[in-house]
């Protein structure tokens, strides 16, 4: 979020909010929302979902970004962004752009996965060498390339929106 903010902050009135600290409805409404979250159970995390509903972000123009513990090419990343999109569309929001990149996996998640794998060898997130490798790789993300790609994505989107608004 900070990297995107640094890239776009001079393109208009832009605010960076810490949603964990935002417990009441903002007095200010925005023309456009860029909403970023980390993945939890193939969707935006509960803090972001609560924020969206608390702030009544319904029927708005939005762009979404999401970090996911797996590489972008993994089906879990697609499922996660698609569920986030569906969550937003259920609230009649218009989605102009999405961005997904790999992000860190909380070590506590792996502990839970190991316990659940021990209990049920068919557990959907069974701890395998491949999963362990993905989690190890996730510690490096978002990396400088991920951050630059996110900056470019939203910078280009806003430049396009501004140029069309002025035309």
Model-based region annotation:
Residues 14-22:
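A short glycine-rich beta-strand->turn/loop micro-motif centered on a GG-aromatic cluster
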Residues 22-29:
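Short amphipathic alpha-helix with an adjacent loop that forms part of the alpha/beta core around
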Residues 2-4:
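Short amphipathic alpha-helix
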Residues 7-15, 32-35, 40-167:
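FMN-binding flavodoxin-like domain, especially the glycine-rich phosphate-binding loop
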């Amino acid at each position: 979020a900070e990297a995107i903010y640094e890239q776009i902050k001079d393109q208009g009135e832009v605010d960076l909010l810490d949603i964990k600290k935002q417990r009441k409805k903002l007095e200010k409404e925005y023309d456009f929302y860029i909403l970023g979250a980390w993945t939890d159970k193939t969707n935006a995390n509960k803090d972001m979902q609560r924020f969206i509903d608390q702030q009544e972000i319904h029927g708005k123009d939005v762009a979404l970004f999401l970090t996911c513990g797996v590489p972008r090419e993994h089906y879990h990343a697609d499922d996660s962004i698609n569920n986030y999109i569906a969550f937003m569309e259920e609230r009649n929001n218009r989605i102009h752009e999405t961005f997904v990149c790999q992000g860190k996996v909380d070590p506590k998640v792996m502990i839970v996965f190991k316990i659940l794998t021990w209990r049920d060898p068919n557990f959907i997130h069974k701890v395998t060498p491949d999963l362990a490798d993905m989690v190890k790789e996730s510690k490096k993300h978002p990396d400088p390339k991920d951050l630059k790609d996110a900056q470019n994505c939203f910078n280009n989107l806003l430049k396009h929106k501004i140029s069309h608004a002025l035309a």
